[in-house]
A protein has these predicted regions:
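Acidic, mature catalytic/reactive cores of soluble proteins
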Residues: 1-171
């Protein structure tokens, strides 16, 4: 037997309340529900309850956070993932404190895109001077990521210096 839906949830009054909410407000409310704390910063959960914070998914979602005016949250998420930058990689997934899964060929590129979107929205580049937990500025972390991608990462991801195409072995 399917669970019974309480009558109060399907009453005319319940629907009227939802009908008066714009689609934009509904989407912004839904967007905010995926942003969660991770330590002293923030992240995006890819999907409850099965998925945690996946680098690529999170960084793609940042475009919506920036456009939706969730800039402090977007900044905290960027700093979170940039703090894990290492030899051209960022985590594909963070599981608790474990960020060893780095088999993502384009999450780093989405991090660059998120930084660009945020700087454009803020009208300047001062955000790039913020300190990341790894002791570098965000700009230094981005430069390190780019250099690591061009040199080739420990898991075989590399950018061709002539075409700038990303190569990734199957993971």
């Amino acid at each position: 037997d399917a669970p019974k839906i309480p009558p109060a949830m399907v009453s005319e009054a319940a629907f009227a309340k939802r009908r008066d909410t714009s689609v934009e407000d509904t989407m912004l409310t839904a967007l905010s529900q995926f942003v969660v704390k991770r330590g002293d910063l923030k992240t995006v959960i890819a999907g409850y309850p099965w998925f945690l914070d996946w680098g690529r998914d999170t960084l793609i979602a940042l475009r919506g956070l920036v456009v939706g005016n969730f800039r402090p949250e977007a900044e905290a998420i960027i700093l979170q993932f940039a703090s894990y930058a290492d030899r051209g990689t960022i985590p594909n997934m963070i599981f608790g404190g474990n960020a060893d899964n780095r088999d993502t060929s384009d999450a780093q590129l989405w991090l660059f895109t998120a930084c660009s979107d945020l700087c454009r929205a803020e009208g300047g580049f001062s955000f790039l001077e913020q300190q990341v937990r790894n002791g570098k500025t965000l700009l230094e972390s981005l430069i390190s990521l780019a250099e690591g991608l061009i040199a080739g990462t420990p898991n075989g991801i590399a950018v061709d210096p002539e075409s700038m195409l990303v190569f990734s072995p199957s993971h």
